[in-house]
Amino acid sequence: MQGVMKVNKTHKILVTALTTCMLMVSGAFGTVADAAKKPVVAEGLQGISVKGSTDLPGHFFLSFAFSRNLIMLDGKGNIVWSKHEAEPKPGGHTGWWDFKKHKVKGKTYYSYHDQTGAYDNYGLLGYAPGERVILDEHFKEVKRITFEASGVTAKGAPLDGHDFLLIDLDHYILSGYLHDKVYNIPGYAQGSKVVYSYLQEVDHGKVVWDWKSIDYPELYGYTITEGDPRSNDFANQKTDAPDYVHFNAMRLDESGNLVCSFRHLNSILCLDRSKRKDQIVWKLSGRGDEFGLAENEKSSCQHYVTVDGGYLTLFDNNNRDKQTRITSYAVNTADKKAEVARFYYIPGKYSQACGSVQHLPGDLYVIGWGWAVNDNECMSVYNFATGKKLMSVTLDNPKNITYRCVYYE
């Protein structure tokens, strides 16, 4: 399934050097003129304030890392659907993650991840064991999904909440974090306990493909500590659960390969779904980068990736420099060449975890700020072509951080 991400000739015009493509926007984005609008929210729902609006015909989907809130906004910023539930255990951080829309054979479904609080999270704040909840077009629950039985998981084992791909109602790709002792880390012959990434594709109840990060010992050497100083503690001195890759996003490319983001590798990996072994097709960014990126072009603790035509677009948290960036790479996978095509940042904006970005027509960018450090803005819509911020959503309680804020038509 190896293929080339061809750069669209029309878009190629936009590809410039990093220094000219960078848009520093202190002062470039005017304040949104409208007075803050206070949407009517259901009792107990996370409070938000909206400034500005867009003409987008679809909806914004907001999910929260540490609370059980889901919010859908229209393009004007009005709440059109919401859901709230008290935490089963106060202070338990049992959030609803990754609220999204799916179109399958002409039918609309929605889904979110329910961190139920019933499973062990290995002491990791960034691991949310639970179940994927599927809703029909009327938001009625259709089914709940957990892992199927495989060589490493029991049927009903919890999923991780970072991402989920619905191919059909009975065909999907799942993600999870598993805890085990391994003996293939160079220099640790006595064995090390680790938390590793496990991906499982299920078609009508049958596991048709899976992937385990521990099958690729070279990845241990690529682990970075910018997001978690314990992530490479293979001696298990401070933790018996080093989260050494930290999977957080996946997309299918045009060849059917799975393009995945791994925060603690600072890297994007492409996985071949037609293979059981030697499944890694290529690595972009991080210590294992195969595309010749300069150090300042590499991502740092990125949380989101999209396959955007001929580009890979990242929400680069950039824990290294504490200045979050939006970066798009034009990638030629056949020749292992990549260049920075678009690069934006807003001075002072830093998200230490979570977050998302989508590039829409007209050079609009929908940005979910995740765990924003220095303000309570959780979502922005920017037109980088004109230097305008069209819409801004802020949290009444800034501690109740969003997981993702994404747009669907």
What spans do the regions from the language model cover?
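Short intrinsically disordered terminal tails
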Residues: 2-3, 35
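Bacterial N-terminal signal peptides that target proteins for export
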Residues: 6-18
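Intrinsically disordered, low-complexity peptide-like regions
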Residues: 6-9, 32, 77
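Short intrinsically disordered, low-complexity coil segments enriched in acidic
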Residues: 1-2, 72
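Sec-dependent signal peptide cleavage junction
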Residues: 24-38
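Histidine-/acidic-rich catalytic cores in large beta-rich domains
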Residues: 36-409
